């Protein structure tokens, strides 16, 4: 099975960044809400948050 890279739209990135700014760790309920609102899977939202936290650690 080949893995493909998700390209997020500007709107999706903006909403995810806003959520991350409020809380670095997303709740299960909020993850579900964001996934539905942004047209993403919960796994994609979870992965985005994991990657964003890793990016933050790398910068520091």
Swiss-Prot record:
Q: Which UniProt keywords apply?
A: Developmental protein, DNA-binding, Homeobox, Nucleus
Q: Which residues form the signal peptide?
A: none
**Which residue ranges does the Swiss-Prot or TrEMBL entry mark as DNA-binding?**
1-60
Which GO cellular component terms are attached?
nucleus
Q: Matching PROSITE patterns, A to Z?
A: HOMEOBOX_1, HOMEOBOX_2
Q: Give the subcellular location.
A: Nucleus
Top-rank taxon, per record: Eukaryota
Primary location: nucleus
By sequence similarity, the record places it as follows: Belongs to the Caudal homeobox family.
Q: What is this protein called?
A: Homeobox protein CHOX-CAD2
């Amino acid at each position: 099975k080949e893995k493909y890279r998700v390209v997020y739209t500007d709107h999706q990135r903006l909403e995810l960044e806003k959520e991350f700014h409020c809380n670095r760790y997303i709740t299960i309920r909020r993850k579900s809400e964001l996934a539905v609102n942004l047209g993403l899977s919960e796994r994609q939202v979870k992965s985005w948050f994991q990657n964003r936290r890793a990016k933050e650690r790398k910068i520091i």
